[in-house]
């Protein structure tokens, strides 16, 4: 599962950028400057909102899809994108027992590290809470869980996601191959 799509995403930062865009739709430069004063990870946050079709950039203009309940709106947008929703759905399944009851989740250290980007995003959105004493995680917002669990994707959406992942993997393989080739040429120029 690709939990890294949530790397450097923090709900308060996302909401701050969204609100700044609402207040300054005609001046993206101002939005960036205001955001950067108190927040971090501007590019990741901006790309995330653009990828979810919450924001659209046209020159220095920012087109914003407006919604009064930002948290629910954001989750709804995430559900529409398999790139984000599949890791989210997979991770949240850990909070469901075999009897279909909500339980606390205590991941092993490897999974905890692997899923840390997504987990930290959920903690920042007050969907999950870390209990330090028992070192487990508690689901705070079960309404979001139900919504995400019920989400489904068309075969076309899943095929497109698989195609995109294959293209990304192929590009990475080509990059590694080229680097190895250059390293070999340093050793022996006749290769």
Q: Where do the protein language model's features map onto the residues?
A:
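A short, highly charged nucleic-acid-interacting micro-segment common to nuclease
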Residues: 158-175
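Internal, well-ordered alpha-helical scaffold/interface segments
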Residues: 174-178, 182
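Donor-sugar nucleotide-binding helix/loop cap in glycosyltransferases
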Residues: 1-152
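A short acidic/basic microdomain associated with nuclease active sites
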Residues: 182-191
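Short, charged low-complexity linear segments at domain edges
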Residues: 154-156
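Short secondary-structure capping micro-motifs at structural edges
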Residues: 33-34, 164, 191
């Amino acid at each position: 599962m690709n939990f890294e799509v949530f790397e450097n995403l923090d709900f308060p930062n996302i909401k701050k950028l969204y609100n700044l865009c609402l207040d300054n739709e005609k001046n993206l430069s101002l939005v960036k400057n205001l955001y950067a004063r108190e927040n971090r990870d501007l590019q990741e946050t901006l790309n995330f909102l653009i990828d979810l079709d919450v924001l659209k950039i046209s020159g220095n203009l920012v087109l914003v899809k407006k919604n009064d309940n930002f948290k629910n709106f954001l989750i709804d947008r995430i559900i529409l994108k398999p790139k984000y929703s599949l890791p989210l759905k997979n991770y949240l399944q850990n909070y469901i027992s075999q009897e279909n009851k909500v339980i606390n989740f205590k991941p092993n250290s490897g999974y905890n590290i692997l899923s840390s980007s997504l987990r930290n995003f959920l903690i920042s959105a007050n969907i999950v809470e870390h209990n330090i004493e028992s070192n487990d995680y508690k689901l705070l917002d079960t309404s979001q869980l139900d919504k995400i669990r019920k989400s489904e994707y068309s075969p076309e959406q899943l095929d497109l996601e698989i195609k995109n992942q294959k293209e990304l993997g192929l590009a990475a393989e080509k990059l590694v191959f080229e680097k190895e080739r250059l390293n070999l040429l340093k050793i022996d120029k006749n290769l």
